[in-house]
Amino acid sequence: MPKLKTNSGAKKRFALTGTGKIKRKHAFKSHILTKKTKKQKRNLTYFSTVHKVDENAVKQLLCLR
């Protein structure tokens, strides 16, 4: 069986933490920022984790399953 290829879009967007959770960036932070408050923009800056429901799908894209 050939080697599995990692999805190149997924490898740019997701990263694994030390505990095995998957880190992701928030959406809505690239343009149309004038109408968003400072607080909204600040909170969108931080990383978040992928929800448990989506974890298996992302792991499959990253060839971790």
Curated annotation (Swiss-Prot):
Transmembrane segments: none
Superkingdom as given in the UniProt entry: Bacteria
Keyword tags: Ribonucleoprotein, Ribosomal protein
Any one GO MF annotation of this record: structural constituent of ribosome
Gene3D superfamilies: 4.10.410.60
GO biological process: translation
Family per record: Belongs to the bacterial ribosomal protein bL35 family.
Protein name, per record: Large ribosomal subunit protein bL35
Biological source species: Porphyromonas gingivalis (strain ATCC BAA-308 / W83)
